[in-house]
């Protein structure tokens, strides 16, 4: 019989919130009797933006801004219906983006 697997990808700008959310998901899945692998840290995506400070001239004066996107991966193997219901009712912070693949 083929194993059923739920793959959850989490993305956030702050790694503390991301790790707390991942811990909540792992704890909920383990409590309901599913096998969990993760959270696996994925490479951090780094975006760098360079902006001219002045409005019209002085091109040599620039400012740089950086935005980091932290990512985690969680695999839930053989989830029970109880696991799926518990994950649907789980309350996570608004700064965390969640992608779920079955």
Curated annotation (Swiss-Prot):
Involved in the binding of tRNA to the ribosomes. Transmembrane segments: none annotated. One of its GO terms (molecular function) is tRNA binding. GO terms for biological process: translation. Part of the 30S ribosomal subunit. One of its GO terms (cellular component) is ribonucleoprotein complex. NCBIfam families: PRK00596.1, rpsJ_bact. Belongs to the universal ribosomal protein uS10 family. This is Small ribosomal subunit protein uS10. Gene3D superfamilies: Ribosomal protein S10 domain (3.30.70.600). Keywords: Ribonucleoprotein, Ribosomal protein. Pfam families: Ribosomal_S10. It comes from the Bacteria. SMART domains: Ribosomal_S10. The keyword rRNA-binding does not apply.
